[in-house]
Amino acid sequence: MEWYWIGLLIVVVLFLLSAVRIVKEYERGVIFRLGRLVGARGPGLFFIIPILENMVVVDLRTVTYDVPSQEVVTKDNVTVKVNAVVYYRVVDPAKAVTEVFDYQYATAQLAQTTLRSIIGQAELDEVLSERDKLNVKLQQIIDEETNPWGIKVTAVEIKDVELPEEMRRIMAMQAEAERERRSKIIRAEGEYQAAMKLREAADVLAQSEGAILLRYLQTLNEISAEQNTTIVMPIPVELLKFFVEKAKS
């Protein structure tokens, strides 16, 4: 008889232990009773009726999913390899359990197919230069598709765009040609500005003989300041005329 009570006590203890569930702060427990959805509970300590009830625990923290590299043909027929990262979390645990068999796998597959679709509709220049725009588009589409599953997609970011080797060489040549073009434009603008300054100076000097002579004498003074230098400079006729006119006056 004593063994009977001991066995009964053990059964009761095991029954109580199997009925206790602890749900963490970042989790929710989706409870089913006789196969019917009761609702999501948590966080805290809960008791369920063994055999009649069961609970599925769902993590509410943000999940980071790395989309594997996808080989895609862009709208302008360029083959590229693209990968991305998707950030999502469960906002409705009951839907995440009842509306889809495996919400994590389903979200991952949807992210891959959507990435291929969006990149395939864009041209290469758009993929390379308008990545933020494509990120927003991807986020909106995936979020809309996963909403019935109780999933919220917070962000999608395209990480790497790998181009074929031949395309990389062509783009490098184009970049070099663009740099050379800009360099030529800058040099041409500099030469144009210098020519304009010289023209302005020539106009000023042409309006005054004294200015021409003054500039000539200034040049002679600068040259004569150099040591160990013998310079033979012709005397301009204008300079002789200037001194003759000064002497007569």
Swiss-Prot record:
GO cellular component: plasma membrane
Record membrane topology: Single-pass membrane protein
Membrane recorded as keyword: yes
Keyword annotations of the record: Membrane, Transmembrane, Transmembrane helix
Subcellular location: Membrane
Listed transmembrane segments: 3-23
Entries under Gene3D superfamilies matching the protein: 6.10.250.2090, Band 7 domain (3.30.479.30)
InterPro entries with a match to the protein in the record: Band-7_stomatin-like, Band_7, Band_7/SPFH_dom_sf, Band_7/stomatin-like_CS, Stomatin_HflK_fam
CDD domains (UniProt xref): SPFH_eoslipins_u1
Family under the similarity heading: Belongs to the band 7/mec-2 family.
Name under which the protein is recorded: Uncharacterized protein AF_1420
Organism per entry: Archaeoglobus fulgidus (strain ATCC 49558 / DSM 4304 / JCM 9628 / NBRC 100126 / VC-16)
